[in-house]
């Protein structure tokens, strides 16, 4: 993992796309997240560029699904959902990235900052990651 030359990026598009994927294709959410992560942090691809994000999603989604993901990501409801999630993160005390709000099997929740090396793992259930 290395920081790409073009970092930082405006990550709104990939975040909104993941929000749509989580809602519409929940069984593929984690794999799509990892695909996007790998594209940027391992392969140096700028996933904020729509064409690059589309290519990143194509192995896991049909061409029609990718078109729907990208178009829905720019729609008002998904823009608002990301705004709401960002507000919730700030209200919970988030002050940087990565910020994870983790819930264990007993329902106990706890925030973690800068602990991305722990996620995603099978033992953690991420309720909110910003």
Regions found by a protein language model. Name each.
Residues 1-40:
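Structural alpha/beta surface segment adjacent to cysteine/selenocysteine redox centers
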Residues 35-130:
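C-terminal cap of thioredoxin/glutaredoxin-like
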